């Protein structure tokens, strides 16, 4: 079922951590990644470390939403570096529905905390991305998140200028 939490950015992480400890595998949505500082306090200091240090699984998904440029640099940008070094945390940045389903299927089989860095621009995306690394390349692009859309455009521009360009779309970030 769905439980609507109050807009208290600190309390939600604690509630979700407790739910995960009870075996519920919750999905927690952070409305802006800039609020990772507040929302992830309990998650990174207990849920992520729980299985890693104490062998007590605390599986949950965090959906961190990013939206570069529309609401300012503090709240809307992608802020995954804030929590990147936490033990027991897996970070993904799917930009297509198939990538998202693959990440979710990994989570179902896992005991870890998954942070899914989403971008609002990906919600309307119908395209699937393909890595292109065969053959000799002059350069290889390795974009993440929303930059993957622009990297596809940059690849075409560079190829028109005579460069042999490969691209690796990074989804599994940690």
Regions inferred by a protein language model and the residue ranges of each:
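Short helix-loop-beta junction
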Residues: 1, 82-86, 150-167
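Thiamine diphosphate
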Residues: 1-113, 117, 122-124
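Short beta->alpha junction loops
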Residues: 4-8, 168-174
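Glycine-/acidic-rich phosphate or pyrophosphate-binding loops and their flanking alpha/beta elements
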Residues: 101-113, 119-160
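Short helix-loop-beta-strand segments that form the rim/entrance of peptidase-like active sites
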Residues: 25, 167-168
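Structured core elements
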Residues: 61, 115, 140-141, 166-167
């Amino acid at each position: 079922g769905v439980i609507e939490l109050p807009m208290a950015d600190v309390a939600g992480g604690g509630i979700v951590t407790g739910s995960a400890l009870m075996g519920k595998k919750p999905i927690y949505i952070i409305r802006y990644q800039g609020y990772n500082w507040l929302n992830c306090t309990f998650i990174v200091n207990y849920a992520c470390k729980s299985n890693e240090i104490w062998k007590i699984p605390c599986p949950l998904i965090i959906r961190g939403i990013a939206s570069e440029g529309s609401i300012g640099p503090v709240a809307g940008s992608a802020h995954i570096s804030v929590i990147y070094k936490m033990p027991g945390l897996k970070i993904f940045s799917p930009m297509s529905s198939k990538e998202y389903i693959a990440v979710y299927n990994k989570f179902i089989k896992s005991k870890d905390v998954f942070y899914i860095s989403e971008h609002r621009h990906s919600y309307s995306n119908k395209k699937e991305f393909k890595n292109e690394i065969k053959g000799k390349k002059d350069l290889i692009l390795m974009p993440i998140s929303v930059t993957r859309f622009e990297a596809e455009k940059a690849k075409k521009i560079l190829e028109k200028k005579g460069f042999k360009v490969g691209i690796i779309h990074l989804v599994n970030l940690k």
